[in-house]
């Protein structure tokens, strides 16, 4: 049996993990099942109990040998397996006394009786000449022995000795009169406490002793007459009260709580009211209900309220020591404790000299007089509590302010310890409490200070081992127990790290044997470590050395927090965050090993573990080391001392950013700004003056979690109200941090508080303290991370009723009309829902302010998860891409942008055109605000151009120094669009109209024309298209803007294109020449155009440019404008009948068009497809600014209607300081530092610089095959790219840094954001290792030279760049894809597939997938927790793609599909069917899931969109498997290859489809399990949900990293939520489930359904389960079944006519017996019957499901005619009657069947035509018109 089962078990689990990882790397999955079973067995609670029980039995053997023969050994085992000793005579609630865990593996050594000479010699040796006394104490039937002990380190070899700390008055020991304080216990029950007995074992011996307790103690000869109590000063009760019994109770909190409740108050005292059964107090057995609590630790709690006592208990840490009393005699009259005002005496530190009364300290009193309201002028820093055993605890003077009272006094020195203020002893006070005491002191302040004498003077920060306390008289040294705490959460009577140094006010008799501290022992390893690090770090840091030996006998200590932390922290009980070589404790698990020390705390830096320095190592190295290092652990940590620093008598005006920056610098002091990684704002506070008017200040705010301190949030400017006070001032920008309003500091203020402060400010001048975002070259690479979002969106911790109240205040002092309607939030953790819903505006709102909410599309994927726990990201039934959802969440709309209430009618997409005509044709449709909204589902051509009405949609949010999409970088890659009418899909998926250029900072106006670029997201990797911007002349502005996208989702309602599908897309690049269009008005008919835009800015670029103008949003076909065929969506209107509109407002444009005569003459510009000259790469960064005079002249000429000339391509984005070159010396130093940083890594380190071209670096990247390791490998190099031209990079190189930003060991999110935001000149640090090829998640492949590929990410990491591949048509994306299992949902629309969550998907990567055989990708990282074996990489050779897009299909080895008319043939379940679908004017309208690289292992239709061609065709259903597409075999293809094949389909699509016989699953084909998540206050569940567009079912679409679901680890994307807290949500809508999840609190139990992995295959023999949803399968389409019925009837008729009537086709009837339970599915489908669509043919078996009970008999066959059921003949029965018979048949079912050859032939051709109408589910609830319902029913 192992000595420490818990530790041994953890080691075995780690070995298993490593073994599994190595097998996975080798691709060996043969042992997965065995290893998984072994792993689960080790982790099971039963196994843990067995281990605990074994340990307890071993302990029992050791304990029984020490129980006196005259005492009975009553013991038991708890439910956890712990050994519990009980005394049969114990009564009155004291029957349970758990045995403390004895960590030594061997049993306690047997020793001889006291008469033995060996025993006597041992005792004499231990006594060292002191007086020895033998004491027998009889344990009473109730209560304890009446004394407490403390463990102190002895002077001999550093051993631990046990001393009597206190003898309680009136106790057994006190009445015996022999046991004295400070006695050293040498033996307990004849067991000497030598080096073989640990202090835990000694404590256990005292606790477990029954009957007589025999003690051998040693006592100093001169101190045998010591006081009996040391606490009389604090515990003396009024003379009117006498207690019958007092007891000292110590409880060691194991993380589950103390287990008792209190009640009472100041007058009556605090009384124990309840004791929780099975809780800690109950198990301890000493505390009883009705006990009065007199003291807690050294704090007298008499006279306190119950709440104050509760607070004292909470502050005690793990060890809680209480003095309780019961059985009062006389009247209880408790008086509150008075402040100690006794003279302050000199504390005496124990020395090795016996009887020494000398003191190294001197004390003195100082009187300070505050003058003219000044402060005292001292800064203090505190060590408070027992968090620093052995350290100099107390309040010290940190610094003295020159010119202050303390400065002029001259007596106070830095490092003086303050022990009293105005006679009030402040020892033990918290730092902030001392500050308050000093502030509240009068004009004259008396301070009592302690200072080391000159000869011994040293900084307390350098020698924190000094232990002082106020003592009286001075010459009496104090007994203080300073120990290195050992981890054992079941020590019940031991004093660990006593609080005597700062809490005790009583006097303690001295030991003549002095205290010895670890720090005082010259050879102590802890002291050496501490000294070494203190010398390295200097006096500003406190160094702590802790030793952990995680020998936890009860393994539940680990279990209770094992799910919260990674494996490497299980043994330590803490998690570590790493930043640039520093490793900080980010969280400590309650009850874990580190927590029990009560020494370390979050933000402490981990310097060294077991002699190995972690400082300077990467996170990967540190984590790897922590996984492997064996216990015991010696941890060296440091803490910056002035974290708690405060200025006395002065407000805390020090900006938190300063302290945070200092914390981040930690140890590394260099010229490099190491703290810049998280420092978002400048520490400099700028004061901005705004004049508040009746409309308010004109900006909105949000709260944002401070990345430097997860426990606090900061207030950030979210957006500016158009033409508001803030915008007009020009000094306030979105992204600025708001730190103060007038004199009120917003530091640590909540969002609601900040709103109230801003609201309460009276009109007039308002002074705002603002911190600007940092803009530095080092930070440019990570600027995209710092897009702000709120950690508390107001709804996390609020009830649903209050959510809208908080959000409605985000816009401050908006005009009254904006606040008329309540802001209704229907989302969970998200402030809005469906962008396609109509908006409700009031006309006055639109005119009075053009403030409008707009979505910020470009949130960094890394930041979306950092510090956030998002519960639901729900966009009603529309599935907006998740990166967009997070954007929406981060930037809630102002309250006046209202979502319609739940009662508002939702306009169906199909009704869009009718609604528009009805709403707009009655008047001038140009009055956009007269309509209820221009946002509902417009006709396709109206949606396509997504510049919204500016009054409604002006984007105002942006960040000053953070490019919205830095990945575009102005590289000039042209977007290709079919038409501007497809721009709607681009807006939905990430628009950016510009990027910053160096010239943007110079000159008042810059002409900018921006290319279309693609944006890709981490995880989702959705192709996101950028809009080619309208050419406008912009005016300078410092605001950042985002493209208006409120229309985005409505614009993307239809997944198909209505016109021009499959056309070659022209390469639009710039505005063409102006042209004149005349439109003749018709009576009572509107012109038929709608416009968008105006004088307000549609788009603000990062450099301050503004895009504005009037654009055509939609042209109605049958209108006068539509008939001209000269205007189209996206055209810019320059002039109307002589009125220049280039700088006109929206209202002016509307009026101009209204007032124009007949005809109306428009001067418009359209985007031109003329090729544009692209500047050379070398000139990109150095494009001179536009001539300012020229720009000014052009700007002046605008009002004369002249069209601007075609724009040139802007230079690539550069950081403002990018032109500043590092000196050679600095560069050399940096390179040297980099080489030192990675010196320990195997391989050859390279540092190179590359210049990106228009296509990026020309690299393809992938992650590590082992998902637990974060790597970024080069898997492909484009021969035409910069990397290939440079020649120094090779395939297999691992990127470590880019532009001084560390990628090594960082998450994919971090790496992606850094890579994407890199400027043009890129400095790369990479390492070359021969073994890298074996670690790469994707096999290396060459990048075709004709493909201008950027840096691309293939293995779950982000793409480095995201420019389009010009060889791929950038088709418009559909708005929706469904998130289904394995986060691989795709929407097949037209010739493209929109991907939601699969990694590595964008036009350029799609092209590469088509061109490169062998390409595969990992499943995104959110699926790491899938319990099944990882999907192997797809190694098959995929279909080659020719330049024209035609595929060479590999030969199929599957059986030949049924060959019938593919245009009309039905899909026969169980057979491969060839079908053809003509797409017409729309796309296919499918979404797919699966692939060989996913657990689904097949390409499966997830949903059929009712607007698409597949739905019109009517044959494809959700759940059908696609085997081939136009000859391309998808049976063994990866997910991306299927996307590629479906994207390239021509007008007529030829598909090979397989419909599983058991496709429409019951839940038996789902793995159903329960998941319990704890929803904490203010936090969400950390998951996103999505509903099917048609049908029911809600699925998990995303797991937020760091959230509750992610930490639990069991949920994955695609899981279906079946119930929430027992409430069935299978049929519930997405909104309903979102509401339920939003409202639940506390423990949330989710019932989850997950498709069994590997249930799909490409043949009927192995395909048994289905991905298809049983409800959505029918609701997703309504097939046109006329051809089906016709073909079936023809088939039946042909068969009948071809068979000779005289020939008997029947065999003898067979009797089949089936036993069916109530929960069983029968598993057969039947067809035929009277009135059947096939005709009146006999009822026969059309399908047998493999998982049904019928199949188990193996006696039924497809085609068998059913003669009778349970004796009832079926002749003449209708199909429905037969179905009902089978439905209701349970128990023993007798079927008589006949093998009819005619029927068999029909059945063979049909091959079980449908599995849709399972009798186990209500068939009537589904579509009875479906052909499957008419032809056959399935009987369960």
From Swiss-Prot:
Gene3D superfamilies: 1.20.1440.360, 2.30.42.10. Abundantly expressed in germ cells, also expressed in testes and seminiferous tubules, with faint expression in Sertoli cells (at protein level). The L27 domain (also called Maguk recruitment domain) is required for interaction with PALS1 and CRB3, and PALS1 localization to tight junctions. This is InaD-like protein. PROSITE patterns: L27, PDZ. Keywords: Cell junction, Cell membrane, Cytoplasm, Membrane, Phosphoprotein, Repeat, Tight junction. Residues 1-65 form the L27 domain. GO terms for cellular component: apical part of cell; apical plasma membrane; bicellular tight junction; cytoplasm; perinuclear region of cytoplasm; plasma membrane; protein-containing complex; subapical complex. GO terms for biological process: establishment of apical/basal cell polarity; microtubule organizing center organization; positive regulation of epithelial cell migration; regulation of microtubule cytoskeleton organization; regulation of protein localization; tight junction assembly. It comes from Rattus norvegicus. It is a peripheral membrane protein. CDD domains: PDZ10_MUPP1-PDZ8_PATJ-like, PDZ11_MUPP1-PDZ9_PATJ-like, PDZ12_MUPP1-like, PDZ1_MUPP1-like, PDZ2_MUPP1-like, PDZ3_MUPP1-like, PDZ4_MUPP1-like, PDZ5_MUPP1-like. Residues 456-492, 1173-1232, 1341-1448, 1657-1678, 1813-1836 are annotated as: Disordered.
């Amino acid at each position: 049996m192992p000595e420490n089962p818990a530790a041994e078990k953890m080691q075995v689990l780690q070995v298993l993990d490593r073994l599994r990882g190595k097998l996975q790397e080798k691709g060996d999955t043969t042992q997965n099942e065995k290893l998984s079973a072994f792993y689960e067995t080790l982790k099971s609670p039963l196994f843990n109990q067995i281990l605990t029980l074994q340990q307890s039995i071993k302990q029992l053997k050791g304990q029984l040998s020490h129980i006196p023969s005259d005492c009975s050994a009553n013991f038991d085992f708890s439910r956890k397996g712990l050994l519990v000793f009980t005394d049969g005579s114990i009564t009155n609630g004291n029957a349970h006394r758990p045995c403390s865990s004895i960590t030594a593996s061997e049993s306690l050594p047997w020793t001889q009786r006291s008469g033995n000479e060996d025993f006597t010699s041992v005792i004499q040796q231990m006594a060292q000449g002191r007086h020895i006394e033998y004491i027998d104490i009889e344990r009473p039937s109730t209560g304890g022995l009446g004394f407490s002990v403390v463990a102190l380190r002895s002077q001999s070899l550093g051993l631990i000795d046990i001393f009597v700390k206190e003898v309680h008055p009136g106790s057994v020991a006190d009445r015996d009169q022999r046991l004295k304080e400070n006695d050293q216990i040498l033996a307990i029950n004849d067991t000497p406490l030598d080096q073989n007995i640990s202090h835990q074992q000694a404590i256990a011996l005292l606790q477990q002793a029954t009957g007589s307790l025999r003690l051998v103690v040693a006592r100093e000869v001169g101190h045998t007459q010591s006081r009996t109590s040391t606490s009389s000063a604090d515990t003396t009760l009024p003379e009117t009260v006498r207690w019958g019994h007092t007891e000292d109770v110590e409880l060691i909190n194991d993380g589950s709580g103390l287990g008792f409740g209190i009640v009472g108050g100041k007058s009556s005292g605090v009384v124990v009211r309840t004791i929780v059964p099975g809780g800690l107090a109950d198990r301890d057995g000493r505390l009883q209900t009705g006990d009065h609590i007199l003291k807690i630790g050294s704090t007298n709690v008499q006279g306190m309220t119950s709440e104050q006592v509760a607070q004292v208990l909470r502050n005690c840490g793990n060890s809680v020591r209480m003095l309780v009393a019961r059985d009062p005699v006389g009247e209880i009259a408790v008086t509150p404790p008075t402040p100690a005002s006794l003279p302050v005496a000199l504390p005496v530190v124990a020395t090795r000299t016996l009887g020494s009364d000398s003191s190294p300290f001197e004390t003195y009193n100082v009187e300070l007089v505050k003058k003219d309201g000044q402060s005292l002028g001292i800064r203090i820093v505190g060590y408070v509590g027992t968090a620093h055993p052995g350290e100099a605890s107390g309040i010290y003077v940190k610094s003295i302010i020159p010119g202050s009272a303390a400065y002029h006094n001259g007596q106070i020195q830095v490092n003086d310890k303050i022990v009293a203020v105005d006679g009030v002893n402040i020892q033990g006070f918290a730092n902030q409490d001392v500050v308050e005491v000093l502030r509240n002191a009068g004009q004259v302040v008396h301070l009592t200070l302690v200072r080391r004498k000159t000869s011994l003077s040293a900084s307390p920060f350098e020698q924190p081992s000094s232990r002082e306390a106020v003592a009286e008289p001075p010459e009496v040294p104090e007994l203080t127990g300073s120990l290195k705490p050992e981890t054992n959460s079941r020590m019940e009577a031991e004093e660990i790290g006593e609080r005597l140094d700062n809490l005790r006010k009583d006097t303690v008799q001295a030991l003549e044997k002095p205290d010895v501290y670890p720090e005082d022992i010259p050879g102590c390893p802890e002291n050496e470590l501490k000294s070494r690090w203190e010398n390295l770090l200097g006096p500003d840091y406190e160094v702590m050395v802790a030793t952990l030996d995680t020998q936890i006998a009860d393994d539940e200590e680990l279990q209770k927090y094992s799910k919260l932390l990674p494996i490497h922290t299980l043994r330590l009980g803490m998690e570590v965050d790493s930043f640039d070589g520093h490793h900080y404790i980010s969280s400590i698990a309650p009850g874990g090993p580190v927590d029990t020390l009560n020494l370390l705390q979050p933000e402490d830096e981990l310097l060294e573990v077991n002699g190995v320095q972690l400082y300077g190592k990467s996170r990967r190295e540190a984590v790897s080391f922590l996984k492997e290092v064996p216990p015991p652990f010696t941890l060296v940590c440091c803490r910056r001392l002035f974290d708690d620093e405060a200025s006395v008598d002065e407000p805390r005006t020090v900006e938190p950013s300063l302290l945070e920056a200092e914390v981040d610098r930690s140890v590394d002091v260099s010229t490099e700004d190491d703290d810049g990684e998280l420092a978002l704002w400048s520490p400099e506070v700028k004061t901005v003056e705004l004049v508040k008017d009746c409309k308010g200040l004109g900006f909105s705010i949000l709260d944002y979690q401070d990345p430097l301190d997860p426990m606090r949030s900061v207030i950030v400017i979210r957006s500016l109200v158009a033409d508001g006070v803030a915008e007009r001032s020009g000094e306030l920008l979105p992204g600025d941090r708001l730190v103060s309003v007038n004199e009120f500091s917003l530091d640590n203020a909540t969002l609601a508080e900040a709103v109230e402060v801003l609201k309460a400010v009276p009109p007039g001048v308002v002074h705002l303290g603002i911190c600007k975002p940092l803009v530095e070259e080092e930070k440019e690479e990570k600027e995209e991370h710092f897009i702000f979002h709120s950690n508390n969106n107001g709804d996390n911790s609020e009830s649903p009723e209050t959510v809208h109240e908080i959000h409605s205040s985000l816009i401050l002092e908006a005009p009254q009309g904006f606040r008329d309607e309540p802001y209704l939030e229907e989302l969970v953790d998200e402030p809005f829902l469906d962008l396609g819903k109509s908006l409700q505006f009031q006309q006055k709102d639109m005119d009075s302010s053009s403030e409008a909410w707009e979505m910020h599309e470009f949130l960094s994927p890394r930041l979306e998860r950092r510090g956030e726990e998002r519960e639901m990201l729900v966009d009603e039934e529309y599935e907006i891409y998740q990166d967009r959802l997070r954007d929406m969440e981060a930037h809630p709309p102002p309250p006046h942008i209202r979502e319609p209430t739940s009662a508002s009618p939702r306009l169906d997409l199909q009704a869009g055109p009718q609604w528009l005509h009805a709403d707009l044709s009655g008047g001038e449709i140009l009055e956009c605000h007269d309509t209820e909204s221009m946002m509902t589902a417009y006709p396709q051509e109206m949606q396509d151009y997504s510049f919204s009405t500016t009054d409604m949609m002006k984007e105002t949010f942006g960040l000053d120094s953070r490019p919205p999409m830095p990945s575009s970088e102005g590289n000039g890659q042209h977007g290709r669009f079919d038409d501007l009418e497809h721009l709607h899909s681009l807006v939905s998926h990430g628009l950016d109209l510009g990027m910053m250029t160096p010239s943007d900072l110079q000159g008042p106006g810059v002409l900018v024309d921006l290319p279309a670029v693609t944006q890709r997201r981490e995880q989702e990797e959705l192709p996101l298209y950028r809009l080619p911007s309208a050419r406008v002349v912009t005016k300078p502005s410092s605001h950042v803007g985002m493209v208006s996208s409120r229309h985005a989702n409505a614009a993307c309602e239809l997944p198909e294109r209505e016109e021009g599908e499959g056309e070659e897309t022209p390469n639009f690049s710039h505005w063409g020449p102006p042209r004149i269009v005349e439109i003749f008005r018709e009576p009572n008919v509107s012109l038929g155009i709608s416009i968008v835009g105006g004088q307000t800015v549609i788009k603000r670029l990062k450099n301050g440019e503004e895009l504005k103008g009037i654009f055509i949003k939609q042209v109605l076909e049958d209108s006068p404008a539509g008939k001209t065929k000269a205007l189209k969506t996206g055209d810019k209107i320059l002039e109307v009948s002589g009125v220049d509109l280039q700088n006109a407002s929206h209202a002016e444009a509307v009026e101009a068009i209204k007032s124009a005569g007949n005809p109306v003459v428009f001067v418009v510009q359209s985007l031109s497809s003329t090729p544009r000259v692209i500047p050379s790469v070398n000139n990109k960064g150095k494009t001179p600014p536009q001539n300012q005079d020229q720009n000014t002249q052009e700007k002046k000429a605008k009002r004369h209607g002249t069209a601007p000339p075609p724009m040139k391509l802007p230079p690539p984005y550069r950081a403002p300081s990018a032109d500043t070159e590092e000196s050679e010396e600095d560069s050399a130093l940096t390179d040297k530092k980099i080489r030192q940083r990675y010196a320990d890594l195997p391989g050859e380190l390279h540092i190179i610089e590359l210049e990106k071209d228009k296509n990026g670096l020309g690299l393809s990247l992938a992650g590590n095959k082992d998902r637990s390791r974060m790597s970024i490998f080069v898997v492909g190099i484009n021969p035409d790219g910069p990397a290939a031209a440079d020649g120094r990079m090779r395939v297999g190189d691992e990127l470590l840094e880019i532009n001084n930003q560390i990628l090594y060991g960082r998450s994919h999110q971090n790496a992606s954001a850094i890579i994407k935001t890199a400027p043009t000149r890129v400095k790369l640090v990479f390492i070359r290792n021969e073994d890298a090829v074996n670690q790469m998640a994707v096999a290396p492949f060459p990048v075709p030279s004709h493909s201008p590929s950027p840096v691309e990410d293939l293995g779950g990491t982000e793409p480095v760049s995201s420019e389009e591949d010009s060889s791929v048509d950038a088709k418009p994306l559909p708005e929706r894809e469904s998130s289904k299992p394995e986060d691989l949902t795709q929407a097949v629309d037209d010739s493209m597939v929109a991907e939601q969550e699969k990694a590595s998907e964008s036009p350029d990567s799609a092209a590469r997938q088509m061109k490169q055989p062998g390409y595969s990708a990992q499943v995104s990282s959110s699926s790491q927790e899938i319990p099944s074996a990882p999907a192997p990489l797809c190694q098959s050779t995929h279909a080659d793609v020719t330049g024209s897009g035609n595929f060479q299909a590999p030969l199929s080895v599957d059986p030949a599909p049924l060959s019938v008319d593919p245009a009309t043939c039905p899909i026969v379940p169980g057979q491969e069917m060839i079908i053809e679908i003509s797409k017409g004017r729309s796309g296919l309208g499918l979404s797919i899931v699966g692939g060989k690289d996913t657990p689904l292992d097949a390409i499966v239709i997830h949903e059929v969109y009712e607007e698409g061609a597949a739905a019109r065709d009517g044959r494809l259903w959700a759940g059908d498997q696609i085997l081939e597409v136009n000859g391309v075999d998808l049976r063994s293809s990866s997910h991306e290859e299927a996307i590629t094949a479906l994207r390239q389909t021509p007008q007529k699509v030829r598909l090979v489809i397989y419909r599983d016989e058991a496709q429409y699953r019951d839940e038996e084909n789902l793995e159903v399990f329960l998941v319990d998540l704890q929803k904490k206050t203010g936090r969400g569940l950390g998951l996103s949900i999505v509903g099917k567009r048609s049908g029911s079912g809600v699925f998990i679409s995303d797991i937020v990293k760091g959230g509750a679901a992610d930490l639990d680890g069991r949920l994955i994307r695609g899981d279906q939520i079946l119930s929430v807290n027992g409430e069935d949500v299978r049929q519930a809508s997405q909104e309903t489930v979102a509401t339920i999840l939003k409202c639940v609190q506390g423990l949330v139990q989710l019932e989850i359904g997950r498709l069994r992995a590997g249930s799909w295959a490409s043949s009927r023999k192995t395909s048994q389960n289905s991905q298809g949803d049983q409800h959505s399968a029918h609701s997703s389409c309504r097939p046109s079944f006329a051809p089906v019925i016709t073909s079936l009837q023809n088939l039946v008729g042909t068969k009948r006519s071809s068979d000779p009537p005289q020939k008997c086709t029947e065999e003898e009837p067979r009797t089949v017996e089936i036993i069916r339970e109530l929960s069983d599915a029968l598993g057969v489908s039947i067809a035929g019957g009277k009135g059947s669509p096939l005709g009146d043919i006999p009822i026969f078996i059309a399908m047998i499901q493999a998982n049904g009970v019928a199949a188990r008999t193996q006696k039924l066959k497809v085609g068998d005619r059913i003669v009778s059921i349970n004796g009832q003949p079926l002749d003449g029965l209708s199909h429905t009657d037969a179905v009902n018979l089978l439905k209701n048949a349970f128990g023993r079912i007798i079927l008589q069947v006949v093998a009819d050859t005619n029927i068999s032939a029909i059945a063979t051709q049909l091959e079980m035509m449908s599995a849709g109408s399972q009798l186990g589910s209500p068939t009537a609830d589904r579509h009875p018109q479906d052909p499957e319902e008419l032809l056959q029913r399935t009987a369960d």
